[in-house]
UniProtKB/Swiss-Prot annotation:
Cystines in this chain: none
UniProt xrefs under SUPFAM superfamilies: Rhodanese/Cell cycle control phosphatase (SSF52821), Winged helix' DNA-binding domain (SSF46785)
Organism: Mycobacterium tuberculosis (strain ATCC 25618 / H37Rv)
InterPro entries the record matches: ArsR-like_HTH (IPR011991), HTH_ArsR_DNA-bd_dom (IPR001845), HTH_MetalResp_TranReg (IPR051081), Rhodanese-like_dom (IPR001763), Rhodanese-like_dom_sf (IPR036873), Thiosulphate_STrfase_CS (IPR001307), WH-like_DNA-bd_sf (IPR036388), WH_DNA-bd_sf (IPR036390)
DNA-binding region: 41-64
PROSITE patterns: HTH_ARSR_2, RHODANESE_1, RHODANESE_3
Annotated knockout phenotype: Knockout mutant is hypersensitive to bedaquiline. Deletion of the gene does not affect sensitivity to capreomycin, pretomanid and rifampicin.
A Pfam family: Rhodanese
One example GO MF annotation: DNA binding
Protein name: HTH-type transcriptional regulator Rv0324
Functional summary from the UniProt entry: Part of a regulatory network that coordinates tolerance to the antitubercular drug bedaquiline.
Comment field on protein domains: Contains an N-terminal HTH arsR-type DNA-binding domain and a C-terminal rhodanese-like domain.
Length: 226
């Protein structure tokens, strides 16, 4: 009996490698980024604010846990998430943390702002069908091109304040970014409101949109329309 228990413990130790790889906020930042598409190590370091050594070490930990895969192109190393199941796991970890850890809910409210600023996917779909909103993707251009909500205009968050005038017409703005904890959409709400515009944010993001099986377009930005 003890031998059987030891074998099971050894098996679960292997399973626990996944949990160990996830048990670091910096690694979750990387997964958040890679859920949007493949990136070179240097780009990952820049986007997450890590130095190259730290980013590389965290990528190796994620790879050891089976969560990311790598390929080499010339002298550059590229990483991507290992599969859609990894994206689902990452999204579920956030849901579980939000539901069961009070500190997470408090921190999320501090980062994301009021729930009154957000609309659900169902509400977005209804209002978009009715022509009531202008949907703005505030992620970087390369993430937009890798996959975006159909009909969304791409204005990266760093450009939004200078380009709000391009969003003409009387429709409300809805901003979205990477996922439920992405800070770019809440920042977009503040920027647009400071300019006197009516704006909401999607209460999750591109990650959850994909996982819900909703349509995704790829390619260069669409025109702004009205």
């Amino acid at each position: 009996m003890a031998g059987q228990s030891d074998r099971k413990a050894a098996l679960l130790d292997q399973v626990a490698r996944v949990g160990k790889a996830l048990a670091n906020g910096r690694r979750l930042q990387i997964l958040d980024l890679l859920a949007q598409g493949e990136r070179a190590v240097e780009a990952i370091a820049t986007a997450t604010g890590m130095n190259l050594t730290t980013a590389s070490a965290n990528l190796q930990a994620l790879k050891s846990g089976g969560l990311v895969e790598a390929r080499r192109e010339g002298t550059r190393q590229y990483y991507r998430i290992a599969g859609e199941d990894v994206a689902r796991l990452f999204a579920l970890v956030q849901v579980v943390a939000d539901e069961h850890l009070a500190d997470v809910a408090v921190a999320a409210a501090d980062v994301l702002g009021s729930p009154e600023d957000a609309i659900t996917r169902a509400e977005l779909l209804r209002r978009r069908e009715a022509g009531e909103v202008t949907l703005v993707d505030v992620r970087p251009h390369e993430e937009y091109q890798a996959g975006h909500i159909p009909g969304a205009i791409n204005i990266p968050i760093a450009e939004l304040a200078d380009r709000l005038a391009e969003l003409t017409g009387d429709r409300d703005i809805v901003a979205y970014c990477r996922g439920a904890y992405c800070v770019m959409a809440p920042d977009a709400v503040r920027i647009a409101r400071d300019a006197g515009r009516e704006v909401k944010r999607l209460d999750d993001g591109m990650l959850e949109w994909r996982l819900a099986g909703l349509p995704v377009d790829e390619g260069a930005p669409v025109g702004h329309g009205d």
